[in-house]
């Protein structure tokens, strides 16, 4: 092993540092366990303020191990520091091997408590409870040295009670895997969301409307405290084919003078994840040089032209281009809107998808680049 590699192995990451912690203070603390070669607090390039983490390089690997064993979660300037081996192997960090995701954590569980609960299953490379100014966000990550330790932790801890909360413990999924899972759910849905049908609808009538597309497992019109319809509801089919056919044939259909919206039903967490995924894609489009963020608008009423479409969407932000596609002077029923920022496009899509414009409910998606 060459000298540089040896010193890399004796390097520790020090996280969750107080903004006032200095290199001198860290040197005095860590040199009590053995000779320290160097310490670097990472700082903002412009303001030179601490970013809250540092790297400590020891002369001896054994001293780095001793510091990790005896100083992890020590208090410096009122904050508990978090130590782990400095991991310069990008593949190991990103591969997901040995990485575990934990959610539904009690707010009182901190980094130290998390480490204590999971270190019994194997050597931990890193662990962190995610938090903001209000404290714990209720989820965390633990990265084990190998997958077998991670599998033991999942088998033993998933569904167990920690501080009164039943926690979920599972394999960490990277963004590509999460996006693939979302696409799979979207392509195999069986639950349908219906809105805009007014206050006269009930469960039986809604079932009569949708049962012709396939066997229904449940039908529910949402009601207020007086039992009156809130104008939206859900139908659960026993097959994806039936649900898909219902969406295709009923979206935009007139029921008792009301143009209804019919689409895939999503849980709140799925909607949030899908919106977050779309927002990240929008940002990537901008980074790749797109002059704007394009939304594809379908199911346009024949009376909607460029000006009317712009007027309907202008409240969401700066629009650089609007185009309703036409053939021989007649609308083809779809168009494009180019916003100047991902934030504006995301807001427009969230607010306007399914909204009645003219006589039809809009269908909005991110315009794909080819």
Curated annotation (Swiss-Prot):
What keywords would UniProt list here? Repeat, RNA-binding
**Gene3D superfamilies annotated for this entry?**
3.30.70.330
* Role this protein plays: May bind RNA.
Q: Which organism is it from?
A: Homo sapiens (Human)
Which residues are in the RRM domain? Answer: 10-88, 98-174, 190-267, 293-369
Encoding gene (name): PABPC4L
Domain of life the protein comes from = Eukaryota
Q: Does the keyword 4Fe-4S apply?
A: no
Q: What is the name attached to this protein's record?
A: Polyadenylate-binding protein 4-like
């Amino acid at each position: 092993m060459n000298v540089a590699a040896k010193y890399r192995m004796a390097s520790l990451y020090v996280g969750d540092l107080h903004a006032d912690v200095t290199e001198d203070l860290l040197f005095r603390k860590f040199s009590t366990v053995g000779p320290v070669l160097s310490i670097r607090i990472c700082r903002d390039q412009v303001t030179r303020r601490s970013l809250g983490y540092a790297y400590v390089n020891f002369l001896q690997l054994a001293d780095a191990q001793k510091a990790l064993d005896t100083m992890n979660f020590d208090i410096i300037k009122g904050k508990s520091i978090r130590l782990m081996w400095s991991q310069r192997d990008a593949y190991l960090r990103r591969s997901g091997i040995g990485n575990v995701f934990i959610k539904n954590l009690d707010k009182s569980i901190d980094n130290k408590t998390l480490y204590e609960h999971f270190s019994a299953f194997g050597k931990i490379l890193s662990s962190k409870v995610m938090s903001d100014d209000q404290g714990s966000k209720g989820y965390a990550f633990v990265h084990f040295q190998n997958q077998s330790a991670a599998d033991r932790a999942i088998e033993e801890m998933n569904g167990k009670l920690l501080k009164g909360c039943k926690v979920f413990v599972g394999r960490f999924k990277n963004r590509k895997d999460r996006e693939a899972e979302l696409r799979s759910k979207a392509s195999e849905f069986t639950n349908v969301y219906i809105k805009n049908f007014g206050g006269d609808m009930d469960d039986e009538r809604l079932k009569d409307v949708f049962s012709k597309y396939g066997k229904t497992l449940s039908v529910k019109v949402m009601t207020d405290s007086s039992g009156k319809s809130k104008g939206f509801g859900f139908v659960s089919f026993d097959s994806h084919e039936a649900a898909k056919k219902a969406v295709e044939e009923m979206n935009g259909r007139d029921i008792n003078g009301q143009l209804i919206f019919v689409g895939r039903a999503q849980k709140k967490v799925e909607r949030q994840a899908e919106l977050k995924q779309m927002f990240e894609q929008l940002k990537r489009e901008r980074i790749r040089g797109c002059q704007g963020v394009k939304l594809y608008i379908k199911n346009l009423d024949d009376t909607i032209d460029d000006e009317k479409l712009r007027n309907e969407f202008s409240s969401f932000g700066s629009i650089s281009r609007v185009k309703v596609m036409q053939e021989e002077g007649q609308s083809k029923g779809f168009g494009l809107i180019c916003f100047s920022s991902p934030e504006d496009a995301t807001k427009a899509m969230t607010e306007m998808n399914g909204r009645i414009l003219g006589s039809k409910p809009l269908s909005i998606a991110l315009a794909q680049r080819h």
